[in-house]
Amino acid sequence: MFCFIDIACYNRLTMTQKKLRKYAVVDLEATGAGPNASIIQVGIVIIQGNKIIDSYETDVNPHESLDEHIVHLTGITDKQLAKAPDFGQVAHHIYQLIEDCIFVAHNVKFDANLLAEQLFLEGCELRTPRIDTVELSQVFYPCLEKYSLGALAESLNIELTDAHTAIADARATAQLFIKLKAKISSLPKEVLETILTFADNLLFESYLLIEEAYQEADFVNPKEYYFWQGLVLKKEKAVGKPKKLSSDFQVNMALLGMDARPKQVVFADLVKAHFNDQTTTFLEAQPGLGKTYGYLLPLLDQSQKQQIIVSVPTKILQDQIMAKEIKHIQELFHIPCHSIKGPRNYLKLDAFYKSLQVQDRNRLINRFKMQLLVWLTETTTGDLDEIKQKQRLESYFDQLKHDGEVTQSSLFYDLDFWKRSYDKVAQSQLVIINHAYFLERVQDDKDFAKGKVLVFDEAQKLVLGLENFSRGQLDISHQLQVIQKIIDSSIPLLQKRLLESIFYELSHAVELFYRHNSFEFSETWLKRLKNSINALEVVGLDELQTFFTATYTNYWFETDKVNEKRLTILRGAREDFLKFSKFLPPTKKTYMISATLQISPKVYLSDLLGGFSSISTEKIAHEKNANQKVWIDTSMPNILDLSPEQYAYEIAKRLQDIMTLKQPTLVLLTSKQTMFMVSDYLDKWEIKHLTQDKNGLAYNVKKRFDRGESNLLLGTGSFWEGVDFVHRDRLIEVITRLPFDTPKDYFIQKLSQSLTKEGKNFFYDYSLPMTVLKLKQALGRTTRREEQKSAVIILDSRLVIKSYGQTIMHSLGRDFEISKEKINKVLTEMAKFLI
């Protein structure tokens, strides 16, 4: 008998009868992920009226041996399947169970196609509508980082035992589906109406769930939302009247439901004791002490008239403090607090509104529009960092980022997220900011920090932030292509002429650089170019405009090669960044909190921050990090005695040995050329690995590494400073070379001359201390959780044979146990340490 159901008939007879509408949530386990896979297990859960009314599970004999990774993934064995029925024996029962249902699955394309094909071979044609819970989750849970079934189960408190067995996954998907239905039904009718205009871009018939919810949805509740120009935005809840904190730190901690730790109490008392003195206070305290509460609580008690500004190294840490410590404090004490970032972190409502007026050819962009419509009903900040997967369509989000301009003519002037964030600073007793934006903000607006209480958390990273702030780069090759593309588009004549002038100035400068191996950036030339750039009104040239609005004192060209393609890089820098004390306006009080105050025997953190006129210093005794150990490979030849090829070979050989430990391994290199040469050796030896800029950009290769696609990752640049590895409980970190600045670097040469004029030794007063800070920052990349263990091996024998090596090891030795051994002994010790 040939079984057949027509989808149009199905829609008429069943879909319009809500009480009878049934959903079959299906999960299959198979011999592989390809189209020729065979089913080995079926799990089905039937839902009607938001309740599970039936379920079914069976093993299926594929009559073939399972691959080892399938056995490992599912726990299903050949012996188990040998007793199972053939698919033909269960096919008609499965068909009868789901024929009048909407087919639901997590990644429905795989499950529905495979099941439909197998049913067809048994004479049953399955043509029911399909709903994909992956894509619906991406739209209606817009702030999650991962959308695998396991990740969603963890985020949404869904029970998932025996993952990767069909019935367990089907039950978890059924619970997810019920939660999705409830979430969609809770949204205002106006939101669902706009979403439905883009819903055809969803996979298969996923829009049916939205249509069903729309029929019974409530209109916007003005107490909860703003409704303006078709957009629904969440209103922020009013904060209660602030409560006074106790002057006793331990009492405040008890009120928050926590016990104060002894060293935390000492730290808090030191913060309080120095509040009224006129010094810049440097406090040394190791991570894990609980220092965030240790400075927030005493300062909120002491500083009731002056605003407190806390600057932290990264936006991620900024978000973490807001979500944890500050949220806790706000809930109890109702203190007005605010987190502010640069304008480009915020959604510009005008730009998003404009993008909603058109259907994009790229269906994923239209899906992100739906996602953002949902997000606007949840966010009160408009901070795009809340959208964790925006990197997938960065070009679209670049169009939506705020430019910092807010005019009265804006449709969303009163609701503009950047304006609201900017204005909220003045109303807050406590402001959280990151080092990079603090520097940018204070450069333009000294009053932002004037007379305030400042706290720089992890102040040692402020030094590195100052160095980055003082320097910038622009890929001129790429910018010229972008400019030409805009010139060729339909833009006003005046803008076209400005762009043609900019294109000529830059391309002519590049031509002269290659002809004479230099180019003089005269004041006249720079002024002429900047005037043209400032007059631009076209979009798409943010990088160009940002670079030329920075206050650099030096400019120069460099060349680089990526995938055999020559790039021309324009760099800019300023030499006064080491005078941070002069950069700051007068403050009520400034605290510098760091895990490291003494960088080297002669250099302290206060020296690198520009010599404050009056400082006080306090240290809290700290212990070494038991979860991280450092090894120096004494068998590594002296780098300076090796050719580039020999050096790459020595690194690659050690990586080959390290991979025998079967642990995730991060390799930090200081040169792209060396990185690619090492990668070539690994390819030659058929060692699976990922390489930045060869297998993808930094963000993408890290994501693949975190997913476990490879246990070996080679990286440079941002991997030293801004990328954390939190997903692996055990990790090996290989530092191939001490991160000294390149002596040939134009800026480094200028800085060396400047420090020499001041009577300082460039190497010992700047270069060596900065290298120590960069090393410690790199070590911190792999210890982001208490239960995380990492083994670090440094392949630079200069630590042993050079006199300054002792200085570096002395500094590292205060925080980590260090061992100096030959590579074979290192591998043995590392294996034991990582058990």
Predicted regions and their residues:
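A contiguous, basic/glycine-rich beta-loop/short-helix subdomain that forms a polymer-engagement track
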Residues: E405-A426, D445, N534-L642, T716
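Conserved non-catalytic scaffold segment of RNase H-like nuclease domains
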Residues: R12, T16-T128, P142-L160, H164
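Acidic, Mg2+-coordinating catalytic module of metal-dependent nucleases/exonucleases
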Residues: I102-K109, N113-Q118, S148-E211, V792-I794
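Signature of the SF2 helicase/ATPase Hel1-core->accessory helical subdomain module
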Residues: G404-L430, H435-N534, L597-L609, K744
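Walker A/P-loop
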Residues: N276-L297
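Acidic two-metal-ion nuclease catalytic site recognized across multiple nuclease folds
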Residues: F2-K18, K179-F249
